[in-house]
């Protein structure tokens, strides 16, 4: 159990050493392996669908997911230390719903998000907060691949958000 003490015996240079360790809870992982009893967090803005990366998401690419899932996301799973700096979770643009606000971006998907409206994206909460206020009259979302920055007109994206809710989408975000 977390907090319990564990006695260890170690051999070093032919000599026995006695050590004591306290069991700790493992640190929070950048990428959850699985989520139990909880739906994954998401944010939809103007037709852009953002999620926090999980192993379950990658496994949804099928039996051969380790070769079929997007390479950038697989790299993040296999080398999380390359993506950890300043992040609590890895947020990515999972897909683009074709809407008047997302014209030209419909082929952009499965890209890691680094910033939104000039704010560093550290988890879903930070993305949601950053997208509340556009900068210089536009929403800007920086991703780690071409086109590098996605621009959304705030009025058009708000109109799309209202339309999605009217068509039965239960919510634009879930934490």
Descriptions of predicted regions:
Residues 1-175:
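C-terminal recognition in membrane/secretory proteostasis and scaffolding
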């Amino acid at each position: 159990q977390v907090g319990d003490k564990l006695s260890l015996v170690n051999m070093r240079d032919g000599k026995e050493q006695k050590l004591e360790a306290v069991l700790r809870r493992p640190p929070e992982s950048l990428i959850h392996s699985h989520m139990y009893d909880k739906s994954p967090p998401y944010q939809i803005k103007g037709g852009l669908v953002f999620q926090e990366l999980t192993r379950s998401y990658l496994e949804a690419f099928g039996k051969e997911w380790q070769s079929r899932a997007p390479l950038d996301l697989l790299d993040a799973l296999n080398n999380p230390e390359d993506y950890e700096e300043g992040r609590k979770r890895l947020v990515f643009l999972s897909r683009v719903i074709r809407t008047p606000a997302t014209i030209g971006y419909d082929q952009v998907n499965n890209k890691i998000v680094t910033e939104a409206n000039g704010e560093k994206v550290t988890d879903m909460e930070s993305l949601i907060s950053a997208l509340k206020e556009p900068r210089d009259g536009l929403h800007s979302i920086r991703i780690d691949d071409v086109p590098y920055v996605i621009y959304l007109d705030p009025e058009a994206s708000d109109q799309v958000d209202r339309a999605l809710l009217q068509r039965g989408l239960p919510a634009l975000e879930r934490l």
